[in-house]
Structures are given as C-alpha cells and as structure tokens.
C-alpha cells in the first residue's frame, strides 16, 4: 500500500509532509525549499510553471501569473469580495456560466479548482521524488471556516491533480495534531490562532492524553475567510502607491508591471519589519513619463506598518471571544496558545494574542509547517500507521431547512462534532399536498432568507391526506470532510430524494463570517421575527380549523353567527399579510370569540358520536409543539 501524504494547500504557500517511521518529514521541493509559493504562471510558450519559477517570471508576465486562488474557490462572481479582488488582482477574474468566479488566462476561462490542482500536482511530484514511488492518496487541509462548496471544490482540485482525497481536515486541528502528538503531559486545552495568507481561523481544542493515546476534540471554531497576509500586503501597497503619487504625481495602479514589482517589494518589506524597526522599499525604474524614468525609495517603519494594519489585527479578537463563548470557557482555562500561518510572525499579532490570553504563545511550533505535519499524522491514522490518535472535529455553521413563514429550522447546530447524522420529521402545510420542497440553508439567523441557500430539491408522490398527516423525515448527514448530504423520505410511501451540496451552490467567503456577526448584531430582530412567525402560524392554523368547522356545521350554524365568523376570518386573513404581531394576535382572539357558537356545535357533535365505534379525535388547530413548515414539524417521542 502506497503512502498517504499530508498537504497544506495554502493561499500564499503550500507544504507537503509524510509520516516517516514514527516521525513526520516535511519534504523539500525541487528548489530545496520546505514550502512552495502557491503561484502558477502560464508562459507564452504554453508552459505551466508552479512555485518559485512562476514567482520569478511574475513581474514580466503579471496577467498570466495567478496567486491567492484559494480566495476564489467556491465563490460567486457577484460577491462583493470578488469584485474587490478584481480591482486588486493583475489577472482577469470572470463570471462562469454557473455564476462562479473563474479566472481568465490567455483568453481561456479556468476554474479555481483547476488552478489549485497545479499546486497539488507540484506537491504530489515533490513527495514522489522523495519516496521513490507513485503517490495517489492525500489528506488536504482547509480553513476551519470553509463552507461545504469550498471543501467540495478542494476535493475536486485533488481529483484533477490525480489524488484521491482521503480526508479534508481543518487547518487549526491539523496544527494541534502536530503540536500534541509528542506531549505526555495529560489533558490540555489549546487555542490555535491561525492567521495565514488569505484566511483567519481560531479553534479551541481539548487534547486528552492517557497511556500514550491522544484524543483531539474541537470544542469550538470561528474565523474570517477573507482576512490574511494578502490583505496586510495590500494595505502596505496602497500606502506606497499613495506616497509615490504624492511625491511624483503619478498613479502606479494603471501599470500592471509596476504593481507586480510593488507587490513583491511590499511582501518583502512586511517580512523584514518582523525583525527590523525600519526598511527601505527601493525600486529603481518603477515607471517613466515624458521627463524620464521614475524611481521609488520610501522608508517604512514597523510603527507605520502597524498603524496601517492595526484594525485588521483587532478584527481577529471578536472570533476569539466567540469561540471561547461557544466552548463555554474563560481565557484562564486555555493552557497553551499555538500560532499558525506566516502572518502570525508579525510582532503586533503576537503582542495582541499575548495580551488577550495573558500568556506567551508556544514557540516550538513552526507556523509554516505545522499544518502539513498534522495532515501527515492524520494520513497515518487513515493508513493504520498511527493507532493512538482520535480526532473529533466540528462543523463551523448551523445547517437546517426553511419552514413555513420563512423560518430556518436548524437540524444540526454549529460546533457539532463530525461526522454526524441527524433527522427531524416534518409534515405538509396544505390538505392533499402531493410534494414538498426541501430548501437547505446554512447560517445562524432565524430568518431563512438572511442565511445562505445551499440548494433545494423536491420530494414528490406524497399520498393525498389532510395537512399534518404525512410524515416527511429529513436527514442531514455530514461526513468526516465536513461535506453535507441531505435526504428527505416519505415514511408512508418510502419515496426518497437526496442532494449533495456542490461547489456551484456554496457560500461566498464574506457571507460565511458575516452570518455569525449578523446573528449576534441582530439578536433582537431575530427574536421579534420569530414571534411574528409564531403568531402567523397560529393564525393560519386557526383559519384552517375554523373554515373546516363552518363547513361541517352546515345548517346548524345560525346565519348571524356565520356572518360574524366570516367577517372575523376576513380580518384575520388580512392581518396575517402584515407585519404587526399584536394585530394578528388580536384578530386571532376576535375569531375565537366569534366562533363560540361554532365550538358549542362541534362539542355537541363530539358527545353525540362518543360511542366506541365512532370515537375519533376532532380535527383541531395545530398543537403548540408542531412547527408549521413549508412543512409542519412532527416531533417524535424518543
């Protein structure tokens, strides 16, 4: 059996590792480096370059050199963040037929997974050269806050690269594996702060060690899938462009070659300022005008850089607080803090993390290699080479379906350990309803439309019956990769329909982290919306039951009472169309009072039919414990 390799597919750099005996070996690439730039260059001669060779030719070929493609995976073209990237990136970002964001190189549209596959091929070849054998299987890491479509797209990239992706695992979890494997110190709770090239994640992980066996359980995760070193670079680039314009009166943003040189210089300056107090950005012949060539020579201090990015560093604190809250832990309960990702080397980042947790982060974890090392350990678990490790990861956002009134009914809560399979039973909202639409959503808001639609499908062929009678079992199944499968089954007929969330219908990066922020900021609005929907659903149930009782009462109902009831019904139906909960509740009460005679008739009939052979439950308004949906929830007693 061949080796399963571990790959950290990063925004800025990628890394590959393998289990070599009892230890992890990070593998050097053909250039002798332990990390490879996630850069792909397409030359005029038709050659595809990956890593340092692509980076070296990027200045002269900016339009056909792709980087930070990980930020486009699973994203829609219309997304605000995509539009912002269009202004920043020197290469073309275009709209695919399915609405996704793709890139354009030499007139050809390419999907992000295809581009990422080139980096994975390089990682695969690097491992094969070291091992001396063909590699066909891999464990690939993704940001903890990646959604279903992004995870699926990452698996697609692996397949394009000729790899069977045995497992997708979260980057902070992988880093914790690398950190915790050699620790024989009993139980610990660690915080993994992962600030990489394009994404930020925080995970709170409990490591239990007993007799050499380790259990890694993720207690909570949070993050921002559009915050990383690339954004820090862009802040510095914008500052340098503004300073040059102030000094020389020329705008460099319209010159792709100049901007590519500036990007490299800004990245280099940022790294230098992690150890030095100031550096020079010196770019001779950066551009030219009628008077001759222009040169850039700008001093940048560490203090200046910190002032440019301070708000982004502070922005990482809210996810930290939320993760601790979700894990039900105080800062004092964190035993160790692990920093992962190249951007975490910045002194301001380290100081911010130290101040927040009240302790220095660990220095014995390599920020660039820990994630790939953890992936290699997980690969060893899957191949059977490592037997004393159990990894329990979580899903970052809640998953559910849209139910009647536009409510999102959660089936799986955020931070649920995966893999997991959970079911709820729903029913129809109308008499003789032959089909239901299962609309799958992801997010934390009560209002389904405020969350993100992942997909929908129809379950047809339901046998005609009164509303609330059919039982539709909806099952959410999240596999170990965090990818969602949804099934709806009619318990009576056995008919079933399934959906697997595909990359074309996934969430955008900005939308994912915005959902949780919105849920917190709009808690009051959500509560009011939920109350309004409850009032509407109770009113709908009352209207349905009353009309049925009027029909059954027939001539026994005096015309005067019938007119009162019809008037009250009309007023309540109008009220339900509005957004005033108090009015809906008042009109519901008015209908109940107008229906007093109707209730007397119904009770008299019930008593008359109380013989055993005719005993049946009268059709009543929906009980309080039933959720009216596009369906109506039937809660099983288990």
Curated annotation (Swiss-Prot):
Residues 604-626 are annotated as: Disordered. Induction: By stress conditions e.g. heat shock. InterPro entries: ATPase_NBD (IPR043129), Chaperone_DnaK (IPR012725), Heat_shock_70_CS (IPR018181), HSP70_C_sf (IPR029048), HSP70_peptide-bd_sf (IPR029047), Hsp_70_fam (IPR013126). It comes from the Bacteria. PANTHER family: HEAT SHOCK PROTEIN 70KDA. Acts as a chaperone. This is Chaperone protein DnaK 2.
């Amino acid at each position: 059996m061949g080796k399963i390799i571990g790959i950290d597919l990063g925004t800025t750099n990628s890394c590959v590792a393998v289990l070599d005996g009892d230890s992890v070996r990070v593998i050097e690439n053909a250039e002798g480096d332990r990390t490879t730039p996630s850069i792909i260059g397409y030359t005029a001669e038709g050659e595809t370059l990956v890593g340092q060779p692509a980076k070296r030719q990027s200045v002269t070929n900016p339009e056909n050199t792709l980087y930070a493609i990980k930020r486009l995976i699973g994203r829609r073209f219309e997304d605000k963040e995509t539009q912002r990237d269009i202004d920043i990136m020197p290469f073309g970002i275009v709209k695919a037929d399915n609405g996704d964001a793709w890139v354009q190189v030499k007139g050809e549209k390419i999907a992000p997974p295809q581009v990422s596959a080139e980096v994975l091929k390089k990682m695969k070849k690097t491992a094969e050269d070291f091992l001396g054998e063909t590699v066909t299987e891999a464990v690939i890491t993704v940001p903890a806050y990646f959604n279903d479509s992004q995870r699926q797209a990452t698996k697609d990239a692996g397949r394009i690269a000729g790899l069977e992706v045995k497992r997708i695992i979260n980057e902070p979890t992988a880093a914790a594996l690398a950190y915790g494997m050699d620790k024989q110190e009993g139980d610990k709770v660690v915080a993994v702060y992962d600030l990489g090239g394009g994404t930020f994640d925080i995970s709170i992980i409990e490591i239990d060690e007993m007799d050499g066996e380790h259990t890694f359980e993720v207690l909570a995760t949070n993050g921002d899938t559009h915050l990383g070193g690339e954004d820090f670079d862009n802040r510095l680039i914008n500052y340098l462009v503004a300073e040059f314009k102030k000094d020389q009166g020329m705008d460099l943003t319209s010159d792709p070659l100049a901007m590519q040189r500036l990007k490299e210089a800004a990245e280099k300056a940022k790294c230098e300022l992690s150890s030095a107090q100031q550096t020079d950005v010196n770019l001779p012949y950066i551009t030219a005008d009628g008077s001759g060539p222009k040169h850039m020579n700008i001093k940048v201090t560490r203090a200046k850089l910190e002032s440019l990015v301070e708000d982004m560093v502070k922005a990482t604190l809210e996810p930290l607080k939320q993760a601790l809250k979700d894990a039900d832990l105080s800062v004092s309960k964190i035993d160790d803090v692990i920093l992962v990702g190249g951007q975490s080397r910045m002194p301001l980042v380290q100081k911010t993390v130290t101040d927040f947790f009240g302790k220095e982060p660990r220095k014995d974890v390599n920020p660039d290699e820990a994630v790939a090392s953890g992936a290699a350990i997980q690969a060893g678990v899957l191949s059977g080479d490592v037997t004393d490790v159990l990894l329990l990861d979580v899903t970052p956002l809640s998953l559910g379906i849209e139910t009647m009134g536009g409510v999102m009914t959660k089936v799986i809560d955020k931070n649920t350990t995966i893999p997991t399979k959970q079911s709820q039973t729903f029913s129809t909202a109308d008499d003789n309803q032959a089909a239901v639409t299962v609309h799958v959503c992801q997010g934390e808001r009560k209002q389904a439309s405020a969350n993100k639609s992942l997909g929908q499908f129809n379950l047809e062929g339901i046998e005609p019956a009164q509303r609330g009678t059919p039982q539709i079992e909806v099952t959410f199944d999240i596999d170990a990769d965090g990818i969602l499968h949804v099934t709806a089954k009619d318990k009576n007929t056995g008919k079933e329909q399934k959906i697997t969330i595909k990359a074309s219908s996934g969430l955008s990066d900005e939308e994912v982290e915005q959902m949780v922020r919105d849920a917190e900021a709009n808690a009051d609005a959500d509560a009011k919306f939920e109350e309004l929907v409850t009032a509407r659903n109770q009113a709908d149930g009352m209207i349905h039951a009353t009309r049925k009782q009027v029909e059954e009462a027939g001539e026994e109902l005096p015309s005067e009472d019938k007119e009162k009831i019809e008037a009250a019904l009309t007023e309540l139906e109008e009220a339900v169309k509005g957004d005033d909960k108090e009015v809906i509740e008042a009109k519901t009460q008015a209908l109940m009072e107008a229906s007093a005679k109707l209730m007397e008739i119904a009770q008299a009939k019930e008593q008359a039919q109380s013989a055993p052979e005719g005993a049946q439950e009268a059709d009543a308004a929906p009980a309080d414990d039933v959720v009216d949906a596009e369906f109506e929830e039937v809660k099983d007693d288990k």
